[in-house]
Amino acid sequence: MTAAAPSQPSQAAPDAAGGPIVFGGSGFIGTHLLRRLVASGGTQPISVDLRDPKNVVPGVDYRRADVRNLRDFAARGRISTIYNLAAVHTTPGHPDHEYYETNVLGATEVTAFARRMAVIEIVFTSSISVYGPSEETKSESSPLAPVSPYGRSKMLAESIHRAWLDESADRRLVVVRPAVIFGPGEGGNFTRMAKLLKAGMFVYPGRRDTIKACFYVEDLLDAIMFARQAPDRFVLFNGCYPDRYTLEQIVEAFRTRHFPKARTFEIPLGVVMAGAQVLRPMSLMGLGIHPERVMKLVRSTDIAPGWLETRNASTRGKIASALDRWAASSNGSFT
């Protein structure tokens, strides 16, 4: 679970004008969000997490708390907006019950905190996992059919936030369902892909045309801030590019611009799965060689950002420039 504070939390508090609070601020997206909030000026943002941040953002009031139990947590002054990013999300990586304990109970506790503090706006990061695996294109209006504990827990968490919204006409809720989010500090799918290409080789497990919805982290934040400015009390949107990029297109964008010497091969899925089982211990080295992660590469996440597209807030052809931005900010290391 992401959520945070340095060992010696700041004692600063928001002023009477009110400021934002970020649950899960020590995580990947949370760290980028906090930088954005600090850069925008205004009241000092509060970050709440169980873990210390890997990268401390100057100007943030870091607090330590567990979103599964916020009954004794208090923030002095008015809170303008809650960003609920706290979650157990890595799959594989956790027993099933941990997804529910953190994601569902966390939603219950965060909305209860919002009631106590009379907060009228929440931004909640859900997941495209609520749609379940499918080769069909999914939009915000598609039926939900999660199959994983993570996806089911996020679906339940969405309903908890909706119940909070429905209690008062003065409240606002933005729910974003992010696809694969990449960028500095990600440490996930795209980082592993970059490591493999840097090592000189990427293997396609049985197919190259898997559609993988994705979004650069700063573009995700742009979309969230855009949604916050909408006049609607409730906004639900998919956080991804509209291009329906295939795995091969993503790999080639990496390879052409940053790893021109890397070679790619396509090997039957069964062979790759057998190799992943044998090399599974190497996942501890950060390469993520795990059978379940291999299967993710052959299952499409074909997601359309319909809400953003209908409002002309979704731009095509950005994967190359997004990778360039990541390379520039990480000195080409893609970390």
Model region roles, listed by residue range:
Residues 64-105, 109, 113, 131-133:
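NAD(P)H-binding glycine-rich loop region in Rossmannoid oxidoreductase-like domains
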Residues 1-9, 303-335:
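Amphipathic terminal alpha-helices
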Residues 131-132, 174-192:
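Flexible, glycine-rich beta-alpha linker
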Residues 186-192, 206-228, 234-235:
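Substrate-positioning beta->alpha
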Residues 109-149, 169:
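Conserved Rossmann-fold NAD(P)-dependent oxidoreductase catalytic core, especially the SDR/UDP-sugar
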Residues 145-174:
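Active-site Tyr-X1-5-Lys
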Residues 227-288, 317-335:
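Mid/C-terminal beta-alpha module of Rossmann-like enzyme folds, strongest
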Residues 20-40:
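N-terminal Rossmann NAD(P)H-binding glycine-rich loop of SDR-like oxidoreductase domains
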